[in-house]
């Protein structure tokens, strides 16, 4: 049986929001079966809960943001990616501000936090969204697509006219499993170009950004002293983002995802298109006495 998972213990972290620059206190708490991932704005009176739901996405400019009952939750994609990577289904995320902490710009610190809290299996089968028919969305030359596949596979291609992002380093594929996610994807950081800084500042974006939490490029090179963590860190981060954005569908995906120059907006459009086409997907689980799911999650981590 492939079971649902939650945290063993409550764990806390502090950081700054990438776009707001605000200090934020975050608490991750265990949640019961079928609870799902729910964000909780504890700085509001009364407290407002915001489910991790693709239908609640209202912000896709340089991050993925949710709105529910007037409360915003910004930049959810890196934590959502880590939760998907470790197979965590049920968790409460308490925040003292509207934006999650950016940490180091990857999902690595969130993976560490979740593993430090401990991950436990729960007494109910995990629910997967199995892709039955292809679903594709486009925006200009950008494409995002789901296809049936026995497992979970992601492929992504980026195109940037920059010497540090040549064509041979613009493509990445991953056969999803916890070990592949942690090793190959989780440490890839978000990135930005100096030329876009003015645009971002005018819109009050990137106010918490620095070389401590992003890869920064000028016209020719990477400005971070420690360089890159992977030679193709840029496209790997796009897969990290996609895994987080797609987890807002409400369950783990069984299928193949392909992105060409896609981003948060198109990823969300793809999930909405999928959920709206009831013939294109189905809920499946692997209860006791049946085969294991085709996606491999690491053994639970008992902190």
From Swiss-Prot:
InterPro entries: Ribosomal_Su5_D2-typ_SF (IPR020568), UDP-acyl_GlcNac_deAcase (IPR004463), UDP-acyl_GlcNac_deAcase_C (IPR011334), UDP-acyl_N-AcGlcN_deAcase_N (IPR015870). The keyword Hydrolase applies. Its cofactor is Zn(2+). GO terms for biological process: lipid A biosynthetic process. Pathway: Glycolipid biosynthesis; lipid IV(A) biosynthesis; lipid IV(A) from (3R)-3-hydroxytetradecanoyl-[acyl-carrier-protein] and UDP-N-acetyl-alpha-D-glucosamine: step 2/6. Pfam families: LpxC (PF03331). Zn(2+) binds at residues 78, 237, 241. It catalyses: a UDP-3-O-[(3R)-3-hydroxyacyl]-N-acetyl-alpha-D-glucosamine + H2O = a UDP-3-O-[(3R)-3-hydroxyacyl]-alpha-D-glucosamine + acetate. Keywords: Hydrolase, Lipid A biosynthesis, Lipid biosynthesis, Lipid metabolism, Metal-binding, Zinc. Its EC number is 3.5.1.108. Catalyzes the hydrolysis of UDP-3-O-myristoyl-N-acetylglucosamine to form UDP-3-O-myristoylglucosamine and acetate, the committed step in lipid A biosynthesis. This is UDP-3-O-acyl-N-acetylglucosamine deacetylase. It comes from Xanthomonas campestris pv. campestris (strain B100).
């Amino acid at each position: 049986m492939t079971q649902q998972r939650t945290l063993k213990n409550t764990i806390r972290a502090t950081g700054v929001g990438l776009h707001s620059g605000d200090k934020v206190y975050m608490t991750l708490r265990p949640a019961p079966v079928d609870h799902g991932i729910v964000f909780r704005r504890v700085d509001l009176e009364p407290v407002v809960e915001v489910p991790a739901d693709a239908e609640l996405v209202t912000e896709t400019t340089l991050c993925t943001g949710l709105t529910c009952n007037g409360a915003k939750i910004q930049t959810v994609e890196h934590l959502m990616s880590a939760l998907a990577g470790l197979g965590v289904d049920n968790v409460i995320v308490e925040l003292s501000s509207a934006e999650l902490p950016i940490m180091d710009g990857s999902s690595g610190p969130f993976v560490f936090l979740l593993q430090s809290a401990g991950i436990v299996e729960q007494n109910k089968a995990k629910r997967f969204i199995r892709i039955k028919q292809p679903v594709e969305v486009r925006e200009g030359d950008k494409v995002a697509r789901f296809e049936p596949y026995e497992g979970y596979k992601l492929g992504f291609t980026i195109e940037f006219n920059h010497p540090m992002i040549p064509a041979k380093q613009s493509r990445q594929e991953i056969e999803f499993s916890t070990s592949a996610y942690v090793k190959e994807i989780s440490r890839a950081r978000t990135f930005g170009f100096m030329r876009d800084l003015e645009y971002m500042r005018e819109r009050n974006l990137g106010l918490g950004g620095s070389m401590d939490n992003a890869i920064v490029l000028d016209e020719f090179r990477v400005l971070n002293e420690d360089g890159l963590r992977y030679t193709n860190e840029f496209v790997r981060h796009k897969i990290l983002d996609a895994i987080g954005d797609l987890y807002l569908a409400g369950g783990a995906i069984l299928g193949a995802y392909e992105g060409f120059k896609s981003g948060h907006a198109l990823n969300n459009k793809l999930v909405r298109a999928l959920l709206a086409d009831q013939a294109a997907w189905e809920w499946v689980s692997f209860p006791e006495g049946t085969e294991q799911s085709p996606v491999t999650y690491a053994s639970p981590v008992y902190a």
